[in-house]
Amino acid sequence: MGFTRNELLEVLNSQELSKEEQEKIIPIMKENYDGYKFNINATNHIYNSNMSLYFLAEYVWSRKIPSKLVDVNIASDYNKIGNMLNLCKGEKKLEILRKTVEGEPIIADIVAKFNPAIEFNENDMISMLYYLGYLTISGENLGMPELTIPNKVMKEIYADFFMQIINKEASFQLDNTISQEILREIAIEGKLDKMVETLKIYLNNLSNRDMIKFDEKYIKLIFYCLAMNMKIYWVKSEMEVNRNYTDILLVPRDRSKGYKAIMVEFKYLKKGDTSKLEDKQKEAREQIIRYSEFDEIKDIEELNKYTIVVAGNEIFVEKIV
């Protein structure tokens, strides 16, 4: 089913990897392949064995971190998540995706048997995602398991599918040219102009889609999902670390290339409530200043700080200098 940490270390030692090499690759493997727990009473997580072995095979052959952290053959199996989620309709599907991508636990009574041909309800779908390793046990609530995404690789898969649904509902497809323009502007100039233009398209196209109960707070999630596809960045968020933290932080993986870092704090107002805009911007500025003093943030070079206030169909951006 998977490797414990000790079993993984045995595999690493069998490949005659030095202590220095192990210290380099274990944190990457932990972030991307660890996190699985299939018993509410279990005390330790396990690593995905298939993905771990793929990573090690690539590393042992090249002595470099693989550029792709998921084998294409394994990734094709993960595309099945879309087919499963499509069995659940409308807002329920989007809400499950929102919770999972944001890191919010899903409390569910895992069923032992289900028959999609007869009936396939929300709890059945959550149970199936659990059995197939798309969700895992992260805690307990009143005797029932709390389920979350186990690791970064799985989060990227969910984020991709979330954007597929959003693109379909918005009748808008972000092409590769626009994606590259957004990335180039962020990385080279530290600006968000093209990203915000794209967010406005989603906001305007989705605001009238009552069938999915679109909320302006989805804009932050769309920003996060788009950022997850920027492979030159580490993406951290309040959703991810589950504590008092900036909403979204983009830090270049390779700081020697001079790419800009980005820090964003989001706030929201009801449509027509722009009289409170300055108050919301001030609140966001104060949070940005406070978070900037965190040890892991204050030493980040080339950090560009922004507040974004979403009010109805409008987006107000302020750069903090």
Which ranges hold each PLM region?
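Domain-level recognition of nuclease-like catalytic cores that cleave nucleotide substrates
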Residues: 296-321
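Intrinsically disordered, low-complexity boundary segments flanking structured domains
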Residues: 39-40, 251, 293-296
